[in-house]
Amino acid sequence: MTIESYIDYTNLKPDATPNDIIQLCKEAKQYRFASVCVNSSYVPLARRELAGSYVRIVSVVGFPLGAVASSIKAAETTFAIANGADEIDMVINVGQVKARNWDYVADDISGVVKARSEERRVGKEC
């Protein structure tokens, strides 16, 4: 395996345009990167651009701060998976970690895992 096959090629800029994501996908295929990582709103576009390729689609949820409600993260996960995401990268609520509110953190993660599981996909939990 080459180093390229380990790269998650990412564009999470808040001002990323559809053309930026199309270019990201084109380059990911060209250089044989493992995956592209995009905001959930761009998962459907990435899926169309990467159709028939081996490049996986990673979607972030709760990005960038992790401070949204757990139910929002679960809904974002459901949307991303339903629209073609192969993997979910979740941002946990750092404030709750700092407060050592482990029950909240566990419930936050569990909500995303459950939403992902309901869509019958396997991803990684962060």
Where are these regions (language model features)?
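Generic N-terminal amphipathic, Lys/Arg-enriched alpha-helix
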Residues: 1-14, 22-29
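Conserved, mostly hydrophobic/aromatic
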Residues: 8, 46, 80, 125
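Active-site-adjacent beta->alpha loops and helix N-cap segments on the catalytic face
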Residues: 18, 38-55, 68-72, 95-115
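Conserved beta-strand positions in the central sheet of alpha/beta enzyme cores
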Residues: 34-37, 87-89
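Glycine/small-residue-rich loop that forms an oxyanion/phosphate-binding "nest" at active or ligand-binding sites
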Residues: 59-99
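Conserved small/polar residues in nucleotide/adenosyl-binding loops
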Residues: 119-126
